[in-house]
Structures are given as structure tokens and as C-alpha cells.
Swiss-Prot record:
<dbReference type="InterPro" id="IPR001787">
    <property type="entry name" value="Ribosomal_bL21"/>
</dbReference>
<dbReference type="InterPro" id="IPR036164">
    <property type="entry name" value="bL21-like_sf"/>
</dbReference>
<comment type="similarity">
    <text>Belongs to the bacterial ribosomal protein bL21 family.</text>
</comment>
<protein>
    <recommendedName>
        <fullName>Large ribosomal subunit protein bL21</fullName>
    </recommendedName>
</protein>
<dbReference type="GO" id="GO:0019843">
    <property type="term" value="F:rRNA binding"/>
</dbReference>
<dbReference type="GO" id="GO:0005737">
    <property type="term" value="C:cytoplasm"/>
</dbReference>
<comment type="function">
    <text>This protein binds to 23S rRNA in the presence of protein L20.</text>
</comment>
<dbReference type="Pfam" id="PF00829">
    <property type="entry name" value="Ribosomal_L21p"/>
</dbReference>
<keyword id="KW-0689">Ribosomal protein</keyword>
<keyword id="KW-0699">rRNA-binding</keyword>
<dbReference type="GO" id="GO:0005840">
    <property type="term" value="C:ribosome"/>
</dbReference>
<keyword id="KW-0694">RNA-binding</keyword>
<comment type="subunit">
    <text>Part of the 50S ribosomal subunit. Contacts protein L20.</text>
</comment>
<dbReference type="InterPro" id="IPR028909">
    <property type="entry name" value="bL21-like"/>
</dbReference>
<dbReference type="GO" id="GO:0003735">
    <property type="term" value="F:structural constituent of ribosome"/>
</dbReference>
<dbReference type="GO" id="GO:1990904">
    <property type="term" value="C:ribonucleoprotein complex"/>
</dbReference>
<dbReference type="GO" id="GO:0006412">
    <property type="term" value="P:translation"/>
</dbReference>
Length: 100
């Protein structure tokens, strides 16, 4: 069975046993997380969420994404700015999908 969940403003299609990278969630490695913004479970489609459905996951690690370079330049003005950014991520392992 699969589910579509929403966390951090993004949607993810998950199945039991999947490992996904999501926007930072509170919790140390080994902590249990319950995601209740379930948009779809199997053939049930929520309006906007499926009532009573939840997805349980275990935090594998807290990590950081790859560095993104932000470069801004104004032409002919000798004006430029370069910044780097690394997003904080949480790596989750999906343990259980409950249809509710």
C-alpha cells in the first residue's frame, strides 16, 4: 500500500520501508514521528486529507542538503554578490501506513 503525504510544503509518495529526505523536523535519530497530513492512501483520496489516516516514520538522521550557490549581479555597475546555502533536512524511514 502507498500513501501521499504532505510535510514542509511538499508532497511525497511513500510506501512502507521507504527512506525519504524531508524538510527539517524536530527529533533526534531513532525518534518516532507521526505524519497526519495524508492526502491519499491506496485508492482513497482525501478532500483535502484522508480522515483518520496517518503515516508513522522513524528519524534516521538529521542532515544538510547540497550547497546551492546564489549569485546576483547588476550589469555594468561592478556590483555582485555571492552567497551559499545548505538546507537542513531530516531523513525518515517509513514504518507504518494506517488508512484510518
Amino acid at each position: 500500500m502507498f500513501a501521499v503525504i504532505q510535510t514542509g510544503g511538499k508532497q511525497y509518495k511513500v510506501a512502507s520501508g521507504d527512506v525519504i529526505r524531508v524538510e527539517k523536523l524536530a527529533g533526534e535519530a531513532g525518534a518516532e514521528v507521526v505524519l497526519d497530513q495524508v492526502l491519499m492512501v491506496g485508492d482513497k483520496i482525501g478532500v483535502p486529507v484522508v480522515a483518520g489516516a496517518s503515516v508513522k516514520a522513524t528519524v534516521v538522521a538529521q542532515a544538510r542538503g547540497e550547497k546551492i550557490i546564489v549569485f546576483k549581479k547588476r550589469r555594468r555597475q561592478n556590483s555582485r554578490r555571492k552567497n551559499g546555502h545548505r538546507q537542513d533536512l531530516t531523513i525518515l524511514r517509513i514504518t507504518d501506513i494506517s488508512a484510518g
